[in-house]
Amino acid sequence: MKKQPIVLLLGKLPPPFMGPAIATEILLRSALRDRFRLVHLDTRAHRSLTSMGNWSIRKAFRTLSIYLRMKWLLLRHRPDVVIIPISQSTLGFFKDSLYLWIAKAFFRKVIFHLRGSNFRTWYAASGTINKAYVRWVLRRIQGVIVQGEKLRPIFEGLV
């Protein structure tokens, strides 16, 4: 029997029940399990909708612990590919790009997963330094998953 490729899938899980968390849950329960060995890293740093978007020491430590857990999962499972959902805001993209750098430190292939359609608009409105960083990051990934064919042009000229 052929060994299943190992995929480290990053993403939030409910609660709170919201689009990205539900999408991650659906992926983890999908037929992908028949073709890949899915390993999941819950990237949720908040426990409720009221704490979303608010900074706290507790959330900073939780985020740091998520990065450390990712390192442990990379060492333990040695995934063939890491799938990272990306944000469409400057701070969110920077935070998400740290997952890329951790994966690349372990010589893993990385695929970004965009859940939304605002990336190109955000990128176009970004400053020169931010655009340069985004291009630098996107040159280091193996691809991007979007939610439909019509969204593929979002990354035209970037990936």
For each feature predicted by the language model, list its residue ranges.
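Glycine-rich, highly charged phosphate/nucleotide-binding loops
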Residues: 57-74
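Helix N-cap/beta->alpha junction signal
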Residues: 20, 116, 148-150
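An aromatic- and histidine-rich active-site surface loop
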Residues: 66, 81-106
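A short, histidine- and acid-enriched strand-loop-helix "catalytic/donor-clamping" loop
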Residues: 87-91, 106-128, 142-143
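Helix-loop-beta element that forms the nucleotide-linked donor phosphate-binding surface
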Residues: 152-159
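A short beta-strand/loop micro-motif in the catalytic core of glycosyltransferases
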Residues: 137-149
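N-terminal beta-loop-helix "entrance" segment that forms/cooperates
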Residues: 44-62
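N-terminal subdomain of nucleotide-sugar transferases
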Residues: 1-47, 107
